[in-house]
Amino acid sequence: MPIDYSKWDKIEISDDSDVEVHPNVDKQSFIRWKQRDIHEKRMQRNIEIKSILIQLTMYAKLNERVDYLLEKLTSTELLDSEKVMSKLNSEFDPQEKFDYDKLIKDKGSTLRKGLKDLKFDREEIENTPCYNEMIEDLFVQIKDDHPETKTDGDKLIEYLKEHRNRIDDVLSKQTIKLDDLLYQKAQLIVSDDLHTGFDRSFLNKDKPEEKEENQDKPKAPEAKKTTVTTTETINSPKPVEENTDKEILDELEILPATKEFAKIPSDNLSKAAEFLIKHPSICTEQQKDALIMTAFDLQLENKSDEAKHIVHQSLLLQYVGQLSDNGKAAPANVINAIKLFFSKIAAESSPAKHAFLEDVNQTFNHIKGRCEIIKEEQKQNAANKEGTGEEEEEEALIQLKALDDNTELSVNIPQEGTKEYEIFTTKLPIEFQNAIKTESIDEVNKEFAKLKIEDAERILEIFNECGVIGISGYIEDEKEFEELKKEYAHETANQEEDQSASVEDTVD
């Protein structure tokens, strides 16, 4: 049976977690690279959330002012810029602009959880314009773009309403995007989320002294006063339990329902959907991996058609599992995800169907290619054994390779004059310096292939010190599926909101 490395494909680590990595990858290097990637994504997500929050707040204030002017002033009065600004300044604070602290104070507990822990620099707040000034600029812009509005008040009102409708459209789209960003943020736990659940102290009282009839007996010693403090920490880390080889194999065992699902023809999507609705528990990453292992075995036996069919069925489980949090969601939510996904791929000409089949082909071709390599290696090993008459122990090598298909390793030369560049030129052997200067990970791996494990690990430590290896990500065309995930997330959120509306007055 071929070795399955898929358990390392989707590793996600936090700042302080211990992880298990591929034997050929340096553990500390992987953790540093992955942490850097997580921090960058977290920072970028917070920047987007802050930008959208400012935009939504600003547009809501602008609409409020435009509505007020349209209600209080006639078409003729709107042509007089001085009168417009005088009316505006009398009703609204001329200096009012975006103020995060004031927003938190005004909204209170009604402000959503993901918006309460943002940090704004002083420059970010100061650089935002006043709302009244923005209205004044809007009038100037409309009159410059449409000269007839300088004398025709009705035309001016028409363009003001048109601009307001565009703002409403932007508000709608940005609200959806903010919901998605906050949903992503809520799925991750960072150190800021950890807090004391409760902290309680109590004092043991002295036991009442019993009156002793016999005065000659010595009195019992008085009870000592003690203070006990109990602290509970929310989201305390769970001890890491290492799985044995048998447990790992048990995790990849195919359930009977999954075996039945694998027999359903690929072109009968309606039957597949009906089966999954009756057995939502198999829509997990674990069962998908078990089917992929079966596909490997079939391809090694040159049963390509059967292997591709198994890949098709396994990806159905994967897509539904990703939409429903890999089996962690309630059965009703998993069923909703099944119905939603199959409705998107039902039509032959739909982009979702095309993207799904493309993923099936790519996955099958990858398995096919790996099996060819495995067969070739088996032939070479057999030939070597026949030639030498004995089994030779293979020497372990360290090779740098990205474990995730959506990331790649990059080779970076440190900037001259920095501490990293000094380490690069003084500690690294000249062979590795030349390989890094080519900026090719293959050239670096060629040098690693010449070293023993101990020497290669020492080189990896120097790599960490001078930062010559980095991780960069790329995104394939999965727009349709990402939109599908967003749609499902919003439907689930709406259902949960409806269920909790009867018992909660406010929603974080």
From Swiss-Prot:
Co-chaperone that binds to numerous kinases and promotes their interaction with the Hsp90 complex, resulting in stabilization and promotion of their activity. Residues 201-225 have a biased composition (Basic and acidic residues). This is Hsp90 co-chaperone Cdc37. It comes from the Eukaryota. It is found in: Cytoplasm. Residues 201-245, 488-508 are annotated as: Disordered. The gene is CDC37. It comes from Candida albicans (strain SC5314 / ATCC MYA-2876) (Yeast). One of its GO terms (biological process) is regulation of cell cycle. GO terms for cellular component: cytoplasm; nucleus. Residues 494-508 have a biased composition (Acidic residues). The lineage of its organism: Eukaryota, Fungi, Dikarya, Ascomycota, Saccharomycotina. Forms a complex with Hsp90. Interacts with a number of kinases such as crk1. Its main location: cytoplasm. GO terms for molecular function: heat shock protein binding; protein kinase binding; protein-folding chaperone binding; unfolded protein binding. Keywords: Cell cycle, Cell division, Chaperone, Cytoplasm. InterPro entries: Cdc37, Cdc37_C, Cdc37_Hsp90-bd, Cdc37_Hsp90-bd_sf, Cdc37_N_dom. Belongs to the CDC37 family.
